[in-house]
Structure formats: structure tokens, C-alpha cells
Regions:
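Mature catalytic core of soluble alpha/beta enzymes
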Residues: 3-4, 14-312
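N-terminal signal peptide c-region/cleavage motif recognized by signal peptidases
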Residues: 10-11
């Protein structure tokens, strides 16, 4: 499995000693920053994330991988809840978020694997997507034989939320949990958005609220051969989204939802994406269009935009 990172680590706005530790989990580099006296909880958080990876990852030998191979696995509450949420997000986004996109992203492109390749149009059009074909009962989780799941479009956000829930139970209210582009600032923080065209940042933002959830999705890190064959695929057309090269969303205490929404917005046509985001006033956004134009909105409740710089 290849590892990816999309985001710059936020800077905490607090006094006192802090500690940041990093591990490679869930196909990315995970950075956890907490007050130094909470070092033990950083270790606990990493172990929790490894447990979530064991369930949600579509790579061998994890549970979703087993489901994709055998099309039935014993009931697992973590996976069942993630699938249930995914069905809700499918409905919320009018089908632009669809975890059965795995029939294309995993079964045909093999994104993140050494044997990745570009499928032909005939194979793409034959690939089956049907989120309603996933069945959950008291003893098992079942998919149809022509369906492959990929929870990568919401899994990291889901993992961030589960870790933050645990830290909240330990009365920890300062720190940052960062899984690539899916981040939670427990208290106030300043962070940068990375240009899709270079390693520099094009915007600096400061959170206005504690428990800010951040999710960034981009076409420029995970692809096969060249960036036109990136991993953000419209489940309606089986083709790559073309309107945006970067989508960053912000909200309060819900990384799972904005991870899924960022995935969906990335593959929507421009007009539909802007209509969707303007309707969801509970979500702030910064978008980089394929022509390099930057569009943003609904930010005032969540972040202060300190600066916007040239993308190139």
C-alpha cells in the first residue's frame, strides 16, 4: 500500500508544552498533537486507529477486503455503522458519494496498489454500483458478487471522529488529530491549504471555534500514470471529476460527514457543487477550480481567512 498526505499540520494556539507523534496508518501519515502530559493517550489513539484500519481498509487482510473477496462477513458494529452513515451520505449528495465506487477504484484501477492500471471504457461502463445491494442483519454483512466497496471517501473522517470521542471522554480539550487532509482542531488553530500545483500554501486560515473539523480532497496526489486518471471518480458516469482540483470543507464536530461531502463535491459538476454547498450553511468551503480560480463561502462562522496567495 502506498502512503499519501495532502495537508499541512495546523499550529495550535495554546500555551504549555505539546507533543506531536506520527505513524503510518490507514494509507497515510497520522499526526497526533496533544499536551505533553497526555503522551499515553497518543499511544492509545494510534492503537484505536489501527483497530479501525483493521475494519475499514479495503487492503488485505482487513475486514472490508474480506467482504470484497467473500461478499459476506460476520456482523461488525463499526463497519455496520460506517455503511449506514455512507448510505445517508449517498442520499444527501444525490448519489455523488457512493462506497460501491470500489467496483471501479479498487477492482479496476487498483488505486494505492503496486498493480494499478488504467481500465478501458468498456470495463468502466460494465462496473456495477448499487449501494442498496449492501445488506446488514444481526449476524452478517453481505454484498452482491459484482459489488466492491471502497470506504476511502469517508473512512479517515470517521476515524478522526472516533479518536476525538475517546479523547473527549478523557477530558482532553487541546490538540490536533490529523489524518492527511482530515483534521480536527480540539481548540483554536492556524493552518494552511496546500496548492494543488506546488508544495507551497495558497491560503492561511485561523479557526474561530474549538472542535473545528477540516476535510481536504484533491486530484493531485493519488492517480495512475498521470493526474487525468486521479482517484476521484463520479459514480454516475464512471469518469474522473473535472470541475475541481482541490476541495476543502469546514464544520463543527463532524469529520465523517465533511469527508464524505468533500469526496462528493469533488466529482460534482461545478453548478451542482455550488448549489449543494450554498444550501449547507453549516459547512464552509474553499474550492480550487480546474482553471485555477479560487471560490469560497460560508466561512465566517468557522474560520478567518488570513491570506490568499498565488497558486503557482
Amino acid at each position: 500500500m502506498k502512503f499519501f498526505t495532502l495537508f499541512l499540520l495546523p499550529i495550535l494556539l495554546l500555551s504549555g508544552e505539546i507533543l506531536t507523534r506520527t505513524q503510518a496508518i490507514m494509507g497515510t501519515f497520522v499526526h497526533i498533537t496533544l499536551p505533553k502530559e497526555n503522551n499515553k493517550e497518543i499511544s492509545t489513539s494510534f492503537e484505536q486507529l489501527k483497530g479501525l484500519e483493521d475494519v475499514l481498509s479495503s487492503y488485505a487482510p482487513h475486514l472490508v477486503y474480506q467482504l470484497n473477496q467473500k461478499h459476506t462477513v460476520p456482523y461488525n458494529p463499526t463497519l455496520a455503522y460506517a455503511i449506514t452513515l455512507s448510505k445517508d451520505y449517498y442520499n444527501d449528495t444525490n448519489g455523488y458519494f457512493d462506497i460501491t465506487i470500489g467496483s471501479i477504484s479498487k477492482k479496476l484501477y487498483h488505486f494505492g496498489e503496486e498493480n494499478s492500471s488504467i481500465p478501458n471504457n468498456q470495463a468502466l461502463q460494465k462496473a456495477q454500483r448499487n449501494i442498496n445491494s449492501i445488506e446488514i442483519n444481526n449476524t452478517s454483512i453481505v454484498t452482491k458478487e459484482n459489488i466492491t466497496l471502497d470506504l476511502g471517501g469517508m473512512g479517515k473522517g470517521y476515524a478522526v471522529d472516533r479518536v476525538v470521542e475517546h479523547l473527549s471522554e478523557q477530558n482532553i480539550s487541546q490538540g490536533v488529530i490529523a489524518l492527511s487532509g482530515d483534521i480536527r482542531c480540539l481548540n483554536l488553530c492556524t493552518f494552511g491549504l496546500q496548492s494543488p500545483y506546488s508544495e507551497k500554501t495558497f491560503a492561511t486560515l485561523t479557526s474561530k471555534i474549538p472542535q473545528l473539523s477540516i476535510s481536504t480532497s484533491g486530484t493531485y496526489r493519488r492517480y495512475v500514470k498521470d493526474q487525468t486518471h486521479h482517484h476521484l471518480i463520479d459514480p454516475k458516469t464512471a469518469k474522473q471529476g473535472k470541475a475541481f482540483v482541490s476541495v476543502s470543507l469546514f464544520t463543527h464536530t463532524d469529520n465523517t460527514k465533511i469527508d464524505a461531502y468533500a469526496t462528493a463535491v469533488s466529482v460534482m459538476p461545478k453548478a451542482k457543487a455550488l448549489t449543494f454547498l450554498k444550501k449547507h450553511r453549516e459547512i464552509g468551503f474553499v474550492l480550487v477550480l480546474s482553471d485555477g480560480k479560487i471560490v469560497y463561502g460560508n466561512l465566517n462562522a468557522f474560520v478567518k481567512m488570513e491570506a490568499i496567495r498565488d497558486l503557482f
